[in-house]
Each structure stands twice: as structure tokens, then as C-alpha cells.
Amino acid sequence: MLTIKPLAAAILIVISFQAFAEMNSAEIQQVGTNNTGSLEQQGSGNYAYLQQDSQENSQAEIFQNGTSNSASVYQLQGSDNNADITQQGNSNNAAIRISENRSGSIFGSGVSSYQEGNANTLDITVTSYAAGVTMSSVGDNNSIRGEVTGGVSGAMLNQVGNNNGIDVNLGSSSYASVSQTGNNNTASVSGSSYRMGNNSTELTQNGDGNHASTYMGSQFGKVTLTQDGLGNQADIYSSGRSTTISGSTVGNNNTVNIDQSVETGSAIFAQSGDGNILNISQQALLTTSL
């Protein structure tokens, strides 16, 4: 007969509590440089909040495993920082905010987030200069929203699953790579205003019944779209000067609409399959030099 001593029993109770804890809340606030904040939660209905102010070379990490959890990271008035959120489970929510100080000196921040499960949401806002952003989700009915508006930044967004959505907005001279694998997904990418330029977007969808839309409002912008599957739709709009649109669709019953209101723009697109539709409209945009 196995006998459990009181100390061993207490340890087992603690381990069990940690593994199945629910409705916990944890908050970390740090001010200064070279800080590291880390939170880990197991269970459901948990809340994690990590804020770092006036910092440089700081690290913020949150890991949650369970359902209906919420995680937030705020990094304010600093530079060369990194923020990372990982969530595993369903119906989780993650938010990251990286903002500049009044002098706009924040730059070089790194942001990453990964979600695995269904019905999760991810919301990232980065106003820092020269930021690198990576957002990924695996599962169904997930949503990713990104505001990367600081300029000269790069965003990589990836989703695997069905009925997922991506919505990203770029600042000037920035790059976005969007990839979706699955069915009935939507992806939307918008660029900056006309006087800011050199934005580039690459959008790839593999699956059926997907919809991609992109608006490029900058000069010298570039859009590349690839869709592989059945019954997909793409809507591409660009305005400004010297914008380039290219891409291809492979499969049947796909529709592509391209609208360019530009100076010296170009559109090169190819389709392979049956019952496809390709519409290209180009209109000269007259500008006045100031």
C-alpha cells in the first residue's frame, strides 16, 4: 500500500493548483533600462498585464495556456525593446502597444505574437520607427489586427486554418507580408498617404473561398498578390505615383479587380483555370507640384 507523507501531499496539492488555476490576475510594471518582465499562466479565465516605461533594451514576455485568457503588453517611451506573447487554447485575447515618446525617439522595437487554437483575437499597435513585427495564428475563426504606422517597418502575418481574418495598416516606407492557408479567409492591407512612399505588400492565399483586398495610397508602392484555390476574390486599389501591381491566380471561378488612379503605374496579372474574371481599370492621376 502506497503511503503519502504530509509534505508530499502538500507538494501534490500545490502542483495541482498551478496546473488547473483559473481566474488569476498578474500585473508587472517596470521603469528603467535593461529590464526583463515575464509572466506565465496555466488555466482558464486568466489575465496578464505587463507595462514597461521609459526603457531601453527591455524584454517583455507573456505565456498563457488555457481558454478565455487575456494578455496585454505596453512598452512606452523607449527604444530597442522586444515584446512577445504566446497563447495556446481557445477564445484568448492578446494586445501589444508600442508607442513613441514625445520626441519620437523610439526605434528598433521587436514585436512577436503566436496563438494556437480557435476563436482567438490579436491586436497590435506599433508607432515606433524601424520596428519588426511578427504575428501568427493556427486554428479557425481567429482574428489578427495590426497598426504598424511608425515608418520604415516590416510586418509578417501568417494564419493557418479556416474562417480567419487579417487587417493591417502600414506607415510610410514599410513592408507587409501576409500569408493565409485554409478556406473562407479574409485579408486586408492598407498603405500610407500619397506623400509618403515606397510601401510594399506581398499577399498570398492558399485555399477556397478566400478574399483579399489591399489599398496602396503611397507613391512608388508595390503590391504582389498570389491566390491558389477555387472561388477566391481579390480587390486591389492604388493611387499615387509609379505604383506597380502584379500577381497570379490558379484555380477556377476566381475574380480579380484592379483599380489604379496613378501616374506611370503598371499592372501585370495572370490567371490559370476556368471561369475566372480579371478586371483592370487605370486612370491617370494629375498632380500639381508645390
Task: State where each predicted segment sits.
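Bacterial N-terminal signal peptides that target proteins for export
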Residues: 1-7
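N-terminal signal peptide c-region/cleavage motif recognized by signal peptidases
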Residues: 16-18
